UniProtKB/Swiss-Prot annotation:
Pfam families: GDPD_2 (PF13653). Disulfide bonds join C45-C51, C47-C190. It comes from Loxosceles deserta (Desert recluse spider). This is Dermonecrotic toxin LdSicTox-alphaIB1bi. Keywords: Cytolysis, Dermonecrotic toxin, Disulfide bond, Glycoprotein, Hemolysis, Lipid degradation, Lipid metabolism, Lyase, Magnesium, Metal-binding, Secreted, Toxin. Dermonecrotic toxins cleave the phosphodiester linkage between the phosphate and headgroup of certain phospholipids (sphingolipid and lysolipid substrates), forming an alcohol (often choline) and a cyclic phosphate. This toxin acts on sphingomyelin (SM). It may also act on ceramide phosphoethanolamine (CPE), lysophosphatidylcholine (LPC) and lysophosphatidylethanolamine (LPE), but not on lysophosphatidylserine (LPS), and lysophosphatidylglycerol (LPG). It acts by transphosphatidylation, releasing exclusively cyclic phosphate products as second products.
Amino acid sequence: LDMGHMVNAIAQIDEFVNLGANSIETDVSFDDSANPEYTYHGVPCDCGGTCTKWEYFNEFLKGLRKATTPGDSKYHEKLVLVVFDLKTSSLYDNQASDAGKKLAKSLLQNYWNNGNNGGRAYIVLSIPNLAHYKLITGFKETLTSEGHPELMDKVGYDFSGNDEIGDVAKTYKKAGVTGHVWQSDGITNCLLRGLDRVRKAVANRDSSNGYINKVYYWTVDKRATTRDALDAGVDGIMTNYPDVIADVLNESAYKAKFRIASYDDNPWETFKN
């Protein structure tokens, strides 16, 4: 996946997909009552990114729905997966379940159109804090109680805090999650980060008893770092410049081994060579 970073305004969806992104990452901030409120990153900003664009969350979802509904004038066939970077650090730990419930209601209504020909993209709920794992259970309970448990087929998970792989595995056990797991690793593009933990995550993904289905690395804006990440075997790279990632994927060394994922690829299935 060529993942566009900090896509928080509806107009940016077109912009990033047109540059080659087949996936976007969107920041979600919450109010004091754990309602998802804005798609907004805010300062401090990464280097080279635009961090002050925003929409109301529900309005962004409507724009995203149009971009991922076949037949809509705004439809992009290429856009197959959306990562919601859930900014739950503003919440108390005991609000995580509520945040999940409210997030599910927002998505059900504004993105999935109450189960009636809504947006088709796969969704990854990315949570920064292992202590907030009940966001997942709250989300699942709500879709089930609202009569749409089948939509969980479209939902995956990520803990984005660069925690020990073993601790993440334990947390998924607590949350009752047995699949659909993406593992992110990374740091703001202003700083350098080695690939040690990425290699551990890839090893877990490729082992017979690992919990990880896919690994993505963030935030990469340089060709050299892109090559290093691909050499380490990642499934996705998050970037402010999707055209840079697309260019590297077109280099002869990578063309033979990697291709841009399409909607027919299963994002919850580990790719076997």
